[in-house]
Swiss-Prot record:
Pfam families: Asp_decarbox. This is Aspartate 1-decarboxylase. Binds 1 pyruvoyl group covalently per subunit. It is found in: Cytoplasm. CDD domains: Asp_decarbox. Belongs to the PanD family. It is an enzyme of class 4 (lyase).
Length: 127
């Protein structure tokens, strides 16, 4: 049996743009993707801390070092520039690997730079 577990999380990223007329997805700085192990075209869940919206889309790599977090297409209706979001990817893990699975979490600063990189969810996330 497999369980769906969090594989990676980008916590408290700031939306830099919302582009309604682009063909779907979220554009994320490729340096940030590499740091947490997310990949282009990967399905992700987006949580908007400002309005509570939760939705799914897929990743498009953005310019390295840009700090870009741009919601494209219909998803642009669910965010505004400067909203704080969480981006989460999931993975299917077999029962025998459940205790050894370690997700990567990037805690972002107000300029979309990685403030802290954690391997495994902290016991309490109060920021």
């Amino acid at each position: 049996m497999f369980r769906t577990l969090m594989n990676a999380k980008i916590h408290r990223a700031r939306v830099t743009e919302a582009n309604l007329n682009y063909v779907g997805s979220i554009t994320i700085d490729e340096d940030i993707l590499d740091a947490v192990g997310m990949v282009p075209n990967e399905k992700v869940q987006i949580v908007n801390n400002n309005n509570g919206a939760r939705f799914e889309t897929y990743i498009i790599p953005g310019e390295r070092g840009s700090g870009v977090f741009c919601l494209n297409g219909a998803a642009a209706r669910l965010v505004q520039k400067d909203d704080i979001i969480i981006v989460i990817s999931y993975v299917l893990v077999p029962e025998e690997k459940l205790t050894s699975h370690r997700p990567k979490i990037a805690i972002m600063d107000e300029h979309n730079r990685i403030k802290e990189l954690i391997v495994q969810e902290p016991a309490a996330t109060v920021l």
